[in-house]
Amino acid sequence: MGRRHVVNRHVVNRHVVNRHVVNGHAVNDGSPGALALRMLPMGEHALLAETSSLEEVLTLHARLEASTPPGVIDIVPAARTVLVQLDPRVLTLTAARAWIESAASGEASRTPQHADVARDHELDISYDGPDIAEVAHLLDMSREGLISRHLAARWTVAFTGFAPGFGYLVSGDWHFDVPRRESPRTSVPAGSVGLAGQFSGAYPRQTPGGWQLIGTTTAPLFEPLATDPALLAPGDTVRFRAKGVRQ
């Protein structure tokens, strides 16, 4: 989900302002609360909105979820994009584009209609990951300090992906950028909790991976036969609860 097109924009003091709709790209008019974005049609059943940051993705996703019209099948956030899947028999691409533009401008209704309700989760974690000492060293703190900061953070599921049930967690309380492993592991055990960039996350199943592993959880992150297979969904909040912390 990443395409780059530059269209008729003016930059003043590093802020994109006074932008217009050109060649089907929805853009920001500089109004307070408005988001700068580009929109691309993805066939006849979806639109892709590109933003400039993860923070804008979270804002746009929340606005869309709070004002979802009939005909929207799914709203899928990612690191810099939001994909809106729709039924064109109920909601045309033109109408969907207008709705997304309204949400981006801050004009869309904040009254939830049939949006899903975000859930709060508390996940047990044992800080026994093989990379925890290395991560503490990289962040110039003690192992105990790393554990304390990770536990203190209130995490939000920004988006899901990579593997079914894998949630990319972000937090305003977490201000660290953790580099990925230089050599990814060919097999990461299910339940492994890791860090990469600004994200934390837990592996729902055994899979290759390059995140720095700091712990493990026994939480049922993905159950294929359940009504809702994935435990975590975008917008949910997560707190980690220490289990078996080594003193």
Spans of features found by a protein language model:
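Intrinsically disordered, low-complexity repeat/linker tracts enriched for polar/charged residues
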Residues: 5, 10, 15, 20, ...
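Conserved "landmark" site that anchors the functional core of diverse proteins
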Residues: 1-5, 23-247
